[in-house]
Amino acid sequence: MIRFEIHGENLTITDAIRNYIEEKIGKLERYFNDVPNATAHVKVKTYQNSATKIEVTIPLKKVTLRAEERNDDLYAGIDLINNKLERQVRKYKTRVNRRNRNRGEQEAFASLPEEKEAVEIQNDENEADNEIEIIRAKNFSLKPMDSEEAVLQMDLLGHDFFIFTDRETDGTSIVYKRKDGKYGLIETTE
């Protein structure tokens, strides 16, 4: 069962908003044979120009579903988020079931009703073009540096992320450029 943690920023989450979110995103449960025990973290933020930003993160056992949408209409934004999440689940479902079929394992996801199967087949054909294909591989040594040096190196190379060995912790870390133009840091733990 998917539980919901819904937080509003500059907005009071009414029962109507809560029910709409739970109804729409709760429909994702139909894609699973065993409904995962998961918590959907939903953050709704309104801006001064009345635009809303909806972020949904659902951490599952082997994958994290995440979608973000900005829209002037809160309910339309929730619908768009739901479509994005469904697309992610279908894509993941196709990969997992294909891999399991090759191994002879039981399918982890539920079969959809027949009317949905036709849509699923069409989507699978479109997604076949989007198969993961690694077209280039690089090998390089990680240099010890701090996060500031890594950001400078990343900007110098014109990349969106940079992997390095943290001089202080001796662990592998990643700096990345966020959508808002600021920087993020991912540190590994053992």
From Swiss-Prot:
- Organism of origin: Staphylococcus saprophyticus subsp. saprophyticus (strain ATCC 15305 / DSM 20229 / NCIMB 8711 / NCTC 7292 / S-41)
Question: In which broad location class does this protein mainly occur, judging by the first location in its UniProt entry?
Answer: cytoplasm
Q: Which named protein is this?
A: Ribosome hibernation promotion factor
NCBIfam families according to UniProt = yfiA
Q: Which PANTHER family match?
A: 30S RIBOSOMAL PROTEIN
State the UniProt keywords alphabetically.
Cytoplasm, Translation regulation
Protein localization: Cytoplasm
Q: Name one GO molecular function term.
A: ribosomal small subunit binding
Instruction: Supply one GO BP term.
Output: negative regulation of translational elongation
